[in-house]
Amino acid sequence: ADATFLSMGIPAGLFHRERPEVGIHLNIAIGLMMSRNLCEITGLTLTGYLASRFLQLESGNNSDALNQTKIILRDAEIFCQKIETRFRETAPNLWDTTPKSEHGMLEETIKNLREQWDIGFNDLLSWVCKNASERHKIKITSPAQGYVLTLLPLCLIIVLRKYHGFDSTLTNVLNMGKEADKTGILVGTWAGAIYGWHGIPESWRSGLVNGREIRIRGEGLFSNSFPKKAKDIYEMELGLTLKEFEVGKKYSKKATTFARPTPRPILSWEDEDANKSNIPEKS
């Protein structure tokens, strides 16, 4: 179960946070456009729900952090059940062809994560690899590998295990490498929901190519309305491409010119015909 599409569930999850059933319906439809794998679609939909769920989390209340974490993980288990119920109604034929061993796979993983939560940090990461290896039936050696049952638990651990602040939380997961682009999106979204706009360092918020567009889209998700003044996505991509080109020019290597050496003149005793043989060719 690949984790490539997990972040696609975030917009619908945030936009319909007051109507989670609608969010489930939309995200299952989005998931079915990208995959036929039950775990991938469940993960995509759960990712969107968790983004909206973290908005309700009180980041300053560290004394109650463990209790809040257990509640969130329990809510995630229940939400996985709702996703699979709706999936069964939406795509009954696909549900019937999905092996029974894959039913409830993500729900059971979240449940086991909740039960294992109090063990050491490194032991918990090792458990993530072991659990994913057994369920995906492939050898997994790093929790940052690109599978649903590795990246989702890993990002939950990074975000909820300790309240370090937005910058430290995001830096921690990016430093783990592997699928850093995917974990960065998940942790960045969830940590952003917890710490809010002002929890992001000013130096990170300033200088973004599409900073204004990102902000007004975030405001649009919060207000459940698409901003009319937002640029088309093509314009945003074009602006980013031009910025990358301008930055790249500063660090591009200058072309080096190669000058051919001046050929040495033939000296007086170096007759060009000196090496020609007077022996006649064999006829």
Model region roles, listed by residue range:
Residues 1-163, 171, 208-283:
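Phosphate-rich cofactor/ligand-interacting catalytic cores and adjacent structured alpha/beta frameworks
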Residues 143-205:
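Glycine-rich, charge-dense phosphate/pyrophosphate-binding loop(s)
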